[in-house]
Every structure is written in structure tokens, then in C-alpha cells.
Curated annotation (Swiss-Prot):
Site (Lowers pKa of active site Tyr): K78
GO biological process, one term: D-xylose catabolic process
One protein family per Pfam: Aldo_ket_red
Protein name: NADPH-dependent aldose reductase GRE3
Enzyme Commission no: 1.1.1.21, 1.1.1.-
Compartments (UniProt record): Cytoplasm; Nucleus
Amino acid sequence: MSSLVTLNNGLKMPLVGLGCWKIDKKVCANQIYEAIKLGYRLFDGACDYGNEKEVGEGIRKAISEGLVSRKDIFVVSKLWNNFHHPDHVKLALKKTLSDMGLDYLDLYYIHFPIAFKYVPFEEKYPPGFYTGADDEKKGHITEAHVPIIDTYRALEECVDEGLIKSIGVSNFQGSLIQDLLRGCRIKPVALQIEHHPYLTQEHLVEFCKLHDIQVVAYSSFGPQSFIEMDLQLAKTTPTLFENDVIKKVSQNHPGSTTSQVLLRWATQRGIAVIPKSSKKERLLGNLEIEKKFTLTEQELKDISALNANIRFNDPWTWLDGKFPTFA
């Protein structure tokens, strides 16, 4: 099993977990179940991934068979953009809990600091970037005029009610987090961001350390996940798996792979990772990186020096320049 980090509310979270993004619903429940058997205890999901029923099914199966208890599993989900209004926050959370068949979440993120028009579950769920049939015909997205602090305070009420244990933010920049800290009652425990050697975001990571906010990395392998989504930038960016620096570091540690080096570069710097894999040997390899090898300070610096500020998951790019999340 992965080592644990202690969040600012005292809750302990595994440093290595399984990301549920793009796990096909047909195999998802079994993958979650098998991952638990291998030792995984952190599962990072989201309403937008469209597989929460299956994630919950895999978790509940493992619990029912006595492999784990609920308190052994750290379950994560995310509030989607269409449900930012305080009237809809708890509604969306309860939908997630109902789909997963669970009573509470260990961590619930605001997925993006972007508020869309509300879409009822019966109209489309998960709604993705849909804000109504008329908007869809026009290729338009209607925003909702909801300040992020209003959404956050609704989440604080969910903590009070025991529906979630922790609040996190995802895809937020430092200035927005700083503003949130000025007005929140319950501090966010984690920030989930795109983080890999092409996008190290060192100032943001340092800011989080100063404020005792755990950084969680997604897309640890850089362009790899986005090539499958036909993103042009990802297709034209050299893969990190074949990068000379990463390959050299891997060769310095016999038995390690380039993907494991990328993950170890993060965890050794205190950043949690949530890679996805369907192969047992890779799942085990990812889980065991902390025991397997330790990078030298120079290797950490050499990998960090690859930073090129290349961001693949940017709404500005794929939503026609209308949402300046990272501007």
C-alpha cells in the first residue's frame, strides 16, 4: 500500500491512488475491485467521468467481501460546473453519493472555477459542456453568475452535515485560492492540478506548501492522456516516456520504468499522484514506486528543468477562448 500524507484537517490520504478518468464503464467496477485487492486505497473520481456507479460498485463489492472497510478507502469526487449554485451543490453531491452507494465522501473538489447554467439530471447527466438544447445548437455555453465563495460555503455546510469530510479545489490558481482563504470557514485540504515535467507550476506548489494545502497531480505523464482525446498540442509535443532526461534517470535505477520515474519525481517532492492503468503489473509498479527507488537531488532538478509551461487541460483552448481559467 501507498504511504500516507496527513491533510490539514487531520485526515490521512494515500500518496498514490487510482484515477478513474476514462475508465470504461464496462470494466470499471472490476478494475476498482482488483485495484483494492492489489492494495489501492485512494480512488479519484468525478461526476464528469460518467462512471461513478461503477466505481461505487467495485468499492462496495470489496467491502462486502471483507477485503476492506469503508474507513480504509479514501473516496474522492468532484462538483461539476453546472452545479455551482448553492441550491444545487448538495443536490449534485447527493446524486454522486446515491450513484456510488456511499454515505459520505472523504474529499470533494470543485472541479473547475467555472460556473455553468444549471441542467437538471433528467435532461442530461453528466452534463459535460451542455447548458441546454438551444445552446447546443448554437455551440454556446451559458455561464451562471455564481461567485466561487458561494459555492464553497455550500460545501462547508456539506462538511457540517457529514456528507463530505474534506473540501478541495481543482484547476485553481494561487490568487483565487488566496481570495478563497480570506472568506472560507473550512480550509481546503487539497489542490488538484495538471502537473508533470512540462508543467511544474513551482510557484503554485510552493504557495500550497506555505498554506498546508496538499497538491495532487493529474496527467503525470504529460501529453499521453490528451493524445487519446485528439488534442493537437498533445500530438505535437514529444512524449515524456521517450525524453532523454527521463530515460537516463530510469537507466540509473535498474528495474524502474520511465513512467515510474515521472511518478516518483512527484511523490518524492510530496505531491500525490493518481495515474490510471488497466494492467496489473503497472498498477503494482505505480503503487510500489516509493519502496522501489529514490531519485537523487540532481535527478529531481534535471527533471524539473524540463519545464516548458505546456498546459494540455486548458478551457481557453478547447472552449474557444471564453474561459480564462489560467490566464
